[in-house]
Design a protein with these regions (language model features):
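Noncatalytic alpha-helical scaffold of FAD-dependent oxidoreductases
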Residues: 1-278
Length: 278
């Protein structure tokens, strides 16, 4: 086990940083030793995956455990669409393995450098989350190491309080050591896409209503910072459109999805698509 090193850690935004000890385990034995290291010094532990969070969720001033070297793909069942990985595996590396076999994951974030453990711990959303849900929909089970060094297997059982507490729990309850994911079959890794201009929020909502009936699965809105007049303002739109119409969409049963659409209030162009036959 290497001694933790003093480093400055930053997130994707580079807006905040923290000067802290950083430990980089290369095995589960190393991980246990770093946990003991922290316990002996009464240190708090933060866990870093890909380091791509916009916020400071993996910052502290005592000890950060960097999981980037826990990056093995343990098994891949290409017939049944199931894969087991360590938490430091980057999504780009995983996609390079599964997509040539016509498999994909749902609820993927926009960066190929995100780590699977971090995606679980933040329950990231993607361009298809309006239809397929967030990253948690991929999870079959995972292993988590607790503060006493013991490991527990947590399954994605309906109504599981422990599962729901850990997924999206930002690493507060332990450190993910292994994740088993179910994969979604795709006809090919080619995507048919279209780009449309959306003048304002009301038209964007209309477009979201039409996504499924048009056979579209992915939607990504891009901000135009130069809009002005009625197309820029959002107060009236939020009071009228969001409260009356967005709440009726089935996808908006969760507050997270509601907030995602809320963020689109000044978006002007939207890219949509679906996987195509090769």
């Amino acid at each position: 086990m290497e001694q933790p090193k003093q480093k400055t850690v930053t997130g994707f935004s580079l807006f905040k940083s923290a000067n802290t000890l950083v430990a980089t385990p290369k095995s589960l034995d190393d991980l246990i030793k770093y946990i003991d290291f922290a316990k002996q010094r009464n240190f708090k532990i933060a866990i870093q995956g890909g380091g791509n969070s916009y916020s400071d969720v993996f910052f502290n001033d005592q000890l950060v455990i960097d999981t980037s070297h826990l990056n093995s793909i343990k098994s891949f069942d290409s017939e049944n669409g199931q894969i087991t990985v360590e938490p430091g595996v980057r999504i780009g590396d995983l996609l390079n393995v599964i997509m040539p076999q016509n498999w994909i994951l749902v609820g993927l974030s926009g960066s190929v450098n995100d780590a699977i453990g971090g995606m679980l711990s933040t329950n990231v959303h993607g361009k298809d989350s309006w239809k397929n849900g967030n990253f948690s929909q991929n999870i079959i089970s995972f292993k988590i190491m607790l503060a006493d060094g013991t490991t527990k297997i947590v399954k994605n059982d309906t109504g599981s309080e422990l599962f729901n507490s850990i997924v999206g729990g930002l690493g507060f309850l332990g450190l993910i050591t292994e994740i088993t994911l179910k994969l979604k079959h795709i006809p090919s890794y080619m995507v048919q896409h279209q780009i449309q201009r959306i003048p304002n929020l009301e038209k964007l909502v209309d477009f979201f209503y039409s996504l499924e009936e048009n056979g579209l699965e992915y939607a990504h809105a891009l901000l135009n910072p130069f809009v002005s007049g009625k197309n820029m303002g959002y107060k009236k739109a939020l009071e009228n459109t969001l409260s009356e119409r967005l709440a009726k969409l089935p996808v908006l049963h969760s507050s997270h999805a509601y907030q995602s659409l809320f963020a689109y209030h000044q978006y002007k162009h939207i890219v949509t698509g679906h996987f195509a036959q090769s």
